[in-house]
């Protein structure tokens, strides 16, 4: 399959932004409808990687996404890399269920705030409630572990989170400069599930 060439990324970015503005605002008829990818994990599989292989190697994730853009030339992505497998694994795992045989990913839906805990949340505050209730409930921290062991797991997860943040930042920067792709449609440069979830939204499940 022939790959697209990107000789004028800055001009292409300007064109893409104009297309999106015209389409969303409706002030004038767009030259064409911009194409937004919600491909999620498909670029990884399309590049011949297994899911776990790419989740555990951000260079492979980058290569797969770059190949995908060169083949299909989307105007926008809802996100580039949202998979925090190594982060949740450092906390004890269980956040993502990956089946390489079927090429599927499932997220475990959990109630992090139980029915009778609203008063506790108000009394304890979000930070204390998160560390004393949510982390043990979601990741098993504190169950059969010393405080030092639990803190070591949290530190490891934060290290993995920083690596994921750096990989995502690299992808956003390089894809803008090389392919003329703007910031993704999410408020943050790239959306991904983190161990410190947006728990205001996720406390009571998906």
Task: Write out the residue ranges for each language-model feature.
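Catalytic cores of TIM-barrel enzymes
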Residues: 1-206
């Amino acid at each position: 399959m022939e790959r697209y060439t990107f000789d004028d990324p800055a001009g292409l970015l300007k064109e893409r932004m104009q297309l999106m503005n015209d389409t969303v605002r409706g002030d004038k008829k767009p030259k064409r409808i911009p194409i937004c990818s919600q491909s999620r994990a498909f670029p990884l599989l399309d590049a011949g990687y297994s899911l776990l292989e790419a989740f555990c190697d951000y260079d492979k994730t980058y290569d797969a996404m770059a190949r995908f853009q060169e083949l299909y030339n989307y105007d926008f992505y809802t996100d580039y890399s949202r998979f925090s497998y190594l982060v949740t694994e450092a906390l004890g795992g269980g956040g993502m269920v990956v089946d390489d045989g079927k090429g599927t990913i499932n997220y475990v839906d959990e109630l992090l705030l139980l029915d009778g805990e609203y008063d506790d949340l108000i009394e304890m505050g979000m930070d204390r409630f998160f560390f004393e209730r949510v982390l043990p409930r979601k990741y098993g921290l504190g169950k059969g572990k010393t405080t030092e062991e639990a803190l070591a797991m949290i530190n490891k997860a934060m290290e993995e989170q920083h690596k994921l943040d750096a990989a995502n930042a690299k992808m956003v920067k390089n894809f803008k400069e090389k392919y003329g792709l703007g910031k993704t449609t999410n408020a943050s440069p790239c959306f991904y599930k983190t161990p410190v979830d947006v728990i205001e939204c996720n406390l009571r499940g998906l």
